[in-house]
């Protein structure tokens, strides 16, 4: 069972998340990047992450919801919105403008050719989702403080019911992404719930309570891949308790990396998680398809894709930090 670094007292689950949000987000971002890679599908470890790596999104949203509550506690609602806007808008627009320029130079963004969607990065469902979640978070927080369990239950029930409504639209229309947003809303609200009502069970107990749900989620994905069952409307709800176990596994992974003096790798991925999300798929696809890289082997393309994604993420943050320091809105 994890313990605090400075004493022998047992680390609570909320302390584990509060102290480890950066490296846990790093775990989530690595899972997302492995899920989206398609360079080395013949290797079992790569195939595993293509099956299960999408849970990185769930882990990321749980941590985001948890962090949003602390932001709302410290700031007025107005300042909260200002802080969210400063974090999202400049980064998304700078990355979008760079993608547009690269697109005009022959590096293609295959997911959209709509200039507005490309520049704002709203064509990426996750960016659209966090914009929606951050917008409604103060209202959800208001209800969670008063009716915590009831609010979470209502959100979960409405999410399941809304999944029964078919939504079909052109990918360039934002309505086409509402299904993704609706499905992941409960995990975001669950993160907020944990911050409002800290879990009182031990970390060990939480791990074992969430493990069956994680294993069941894995089994359902395997069955779906084998073609033995249809998508269940409540499947994403299984990931609420499962995500708690994933947080603890991420913490143990971090401790392993710390033991071999490599823990800063997770912190780097976590620190630049937004920028990495904005860039990695664009870079993956162009490295795989561009004629300049056609003679490279697939493993080399994968390593190059990750390295270039990290470089672009770092440069994007560096540019934003420079511009914000010299801009009136950044002061």
What would you call each of these model-derived segments?
Residues 42-48, 115-120, 167-178, 224-234:
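Membrane-interface helix caps and helix-loop-helix hairpins in membrane proteins
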Residues 1-162, 204-206, 260, 267-272, ...:
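Membrane-cytosol interface segments of multi-pass membrane proteins
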Residues 151-197:
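Loop-centered beta-sheet repeat module
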Residues 12, 36, 73-75, 141-145, ...:
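Long, hydrophilic "mature protein body" segments
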Residues 9, 178-185, 199-275, 282-287, ...:
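Alpha-helical transmembrane segments and terminal signal-anchor/GPI-anchor hydrophobic tails
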Residues 135, 139, 189, 193, ...:
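Specific aromatic-rich, kink-prone transmembrane helix
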Residues 36, 277-280:
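Histidine-centered divalent metal-coordination motifs
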